[in-house]
């Protein structure tokens, strides 16, 4: 199963880019992975920014992909539960899973309605830039769990 990670805007901080590079390399040992950035909208009201950014994200989602949004109001899973969810998708021949991280103001309701699942990484709020590294680490962790490797300690 191919993975695609979408986010809005460029990663600003070098330390975050290093983390992204580290986990991207680790994940690619298990599965094909593509990362795509949608242009960040600036200088508009929050709702207009959400709408325009989500229109850009929508164009990057393949029609046959399973779309998972990362949002603070989503379902919270443990790492083993995320691994099980990803394994179930893989085993049911889902060709591609897309994880999307919104911009600073989140997702438009129309894009949220398109999602197959909405997940929250925590009840805490993280910057949308930090979520990139956290999500990639959790995807890597899920692969190690699915492969019975010793990275995750229960």
Curated annotation (Swiss-Prot):
Keywords recorded for this protein, A-Z: Cytoplasm, Methyltransferase, rRNA processing, S-adenosyl-L-methionine, Transferase
A Pfam family that the UniProt record links to this protein: SPOUT_MTase
Superkingdom as given in the UniProt entry: Bacteria
Disulphide connectivity of cysteines: none
GO molecular function, one term: rRNA (pseudouridine-N3-)-methyltransferase activity
EC supergroup of this enzyme: transferase
Assigned GO CC terms: cytoplasm
Enzyme Commission numbers on file: 2.1.1.177
Main location: cytoplasm
Localisation per UniProt entry: Cytoplasm
Keyword rRNA processing: yes
Record-listed S-adenosyl-L-methionine binding positions: 70, 102, 121-126
CDD domains assigned to the protein according to its UniProt record, in alphabetical order: RlmH-like (cd18081)
UniProt xrefs under InterPro entries: Alpha/beta_knot_MTases (IPR029028), RlmH-like (IPR003742), tRNA_m1G_MTases_N (IPR029026)
SUPFAM superfamilies, sorted: alpha/beta knot (SSF75217)
Catalytic activity line of the entry: pseudouridine(1915) in 23S rRNA + S-adenosyl-L-methionine = N(3)-methylpseudouridine(1915) in 23S rRNA + S-adenosyl-L-homocysteine + H(+)
Complexes and interactors: Homodimer.
Family recorded in the similarity comment: Belongs to the RNA methyltransferase RlmH family.
Protein purpose: Specifically methylates the pseudouridine at position 1915 (m3Psi1915) in 23S rRNA.
Protein name: Ribosomal RNA large subunit methyltransferase H
Organism field: Geobacter metallireducens (strain ATCC 53774 / DSM 7210 / GS-15)
Underlying gene: rlmH
């Amino acid at each position: 199963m191919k993975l695609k990670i979408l986010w809005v805007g460029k990663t600003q901080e070098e330390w975050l880019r290093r983390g992204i590079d580290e986990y991207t390399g680790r994940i690619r040992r298990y599965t094909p992975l593509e990362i795509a950035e949608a242009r960040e909208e600036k200088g508009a009201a929050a709702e207009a920014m959400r709408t325009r950014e989500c229109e850009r994200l929508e164009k990057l989602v393949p029609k046959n992909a399973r779309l998972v949004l990362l949002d603070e109001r989503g379902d919270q899973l443990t790492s083993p539960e995320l691994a099980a969810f990803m394994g179930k998708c893989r085993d049911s021949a889902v060709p591609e899973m897309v994880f999307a991280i919104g911009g600073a103001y989140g997702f438009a309701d129309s894009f949220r309605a398109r999602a197959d699942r909405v997940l929250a990484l925590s009840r805490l709020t993280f910057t949308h830039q930090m979520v990139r590294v956290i999500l990639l680490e959790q995807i890597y962790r899920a692969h190690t769990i699915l492969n019975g490797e010793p990275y995750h300690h229960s």
